[in-house]
């Protein structure tokens, strides 16, 4: 069987094998797998290996500027107006579902939790954070000290859930499989140790395919997202009463797998700079892939959830009342918040999808500009 094996055209300082603990864990996984590790398993180790992966180690992730030692900024760190606008949709969802619990997956620095708790007040009896990172949990506990009586942390999904769920930039950090078409044949891309000791790629023939046919015969690299779909399906099975809202960057299926998007969407973030090499500086930078929102919607529907809507972050926040908040804000606050809705910043690239357990309703955030028909 033919394999396609090659290096990454990297500079020589990436070539040596580092004898650090994360490298040893990856090498042990490679050995157990026969020398070839599917990318989703590599990505899981790089991001979540206990105490060593990017989201499990002590490095600072979130912040507005690289001078802070951070790697990227998310909307809640940019401005509290994000959380205040989202809170209006959450309040409506709590009322419609008859619940008083709020759940957040991957709470990051705790900024969004603090904003929601402040805005919602007594409408939330309990705020539960599900996060794999012990280091981030410590930071969240510090940020949420004023709300300590309401907040609870969990490291895994409970068997049963009631309430409203929010997840901001959670789905993009779930491991993906890489598939590539070369010479008309499909391969799965995995990670190997090259002869010189560096990490490299090796493509192996596979039965895996993107969810849609990719037109043309040109070489093509993309991702498939079984873990994100499985997460939504499990969430749907366990959400007995409530709703869920996920905010992330991504596209509907037709855009995601467009013939011209032939280089995939995997990106890395460090020091507020982006690169496309997940095999360099492993554990020291974020690895992400855009979200296939059609796959997310179908996973929820197949498991019994109703899709409340799907739209851009800009339209969602404006529907939720961001404009009056901007008018009442200071000039510096308005400048920062403009990034949330500007089409060349977060406004168009980021999307919002909403689900309800049971019967849906005309949700505030999707009142205008709902794009569910594009999924």
Model region roles, listed by residue range:
Residues 46, 165, 296:
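A residue-level signal for conserved active-site and pocket-lining positions in enzyme catalytic cores
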Residues 160-180, 225-226, 238, 244:
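A short SAM/SAH-binding and catalytic strip from SAM-dependent methyltransferases
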